[in-house]
């Protein structure tokens, strides 16, 4: 089994509350690269146990479940379907810096039984996806 991680960060010129308000609306992710729509799956709308289905412009869909939630600090989620992986856990965290900026970090760990080449291609894809999505988010402030 192949396993690896991807971690991307960006500093955004905003305050912590505004950034948390933006990223914690887990179905309002217009900054997510290639996202067409996102909807809730179930009654819970935030916090541990909330579920969402992200539909992408290429027709793919990814179902994610929130498994960690600390307001104004982080949320963690797992993908349960839609990715070419056997395991995927990610955390998006924010940290207040001096000078009214906030550092946002998107980090994930994943594993797959795919071939080494397929796995390496996915790592490149995911790294670019995180970087572009965070750039999109930064551009909204």
Roles of regions detected by a PLM:
Residues 1-44:
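Hydrophobic ligand-binding cavity/cleft-lining segments
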Residues 1-11, 17, 95-103, 128-131, ...:
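Hydrophobic-ligand-binding modules of eukaryotic lipid transfer/binding families
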Residues 6-8, 50-52, 64, 90, ...:
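Hydrophobic residues positioned within well-ordered beta-strands of beta-sheet architectures
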Residues 34-36, 46-48, 72-78:
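Short Pro/Gly-enriched beta-strand edge/turn motifs at strand-loop
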Residues 56-101, 109-111:
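Hydrophobic-ligand binding "helix-grip"
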Residues 62-63, 104-105, 118, 122:
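C-terminal and inter-domain tail/linker signature
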Residues 109-141:
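A conserved amphipathic terminal alpha-helix motif
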């Amino acid at each position: 089994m192949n396993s690896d991680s991807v971690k991307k960060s960006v500093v955004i010129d905003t305050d912590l509350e505004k950034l948390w308000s933006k990223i914690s609306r887990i179905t309002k992710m217009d900054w997510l690269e290639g996202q067409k729509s996102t909807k809730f799956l179930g009654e819970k709308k935030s916090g541990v146990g909330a579920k969402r289905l992200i539909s992408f412009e290429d027709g793919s869909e990814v179902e994610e479940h929130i498994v960690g939630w600390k307001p104004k600090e982080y949320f963690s989620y797992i993908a349960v379907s839609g990715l070419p992986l056997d395991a995927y856990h990610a955390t998006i965290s924010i940290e207040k810096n001096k000078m009214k900026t906030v550092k946002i970090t998107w980090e994930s760990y994943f594993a797959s039984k795919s071939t080494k080449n397929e796995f390496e291609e996915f790592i490149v894809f995911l790294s670019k996806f995180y970087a572009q999505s965070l750039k999109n988010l930064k551009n909204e402030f």
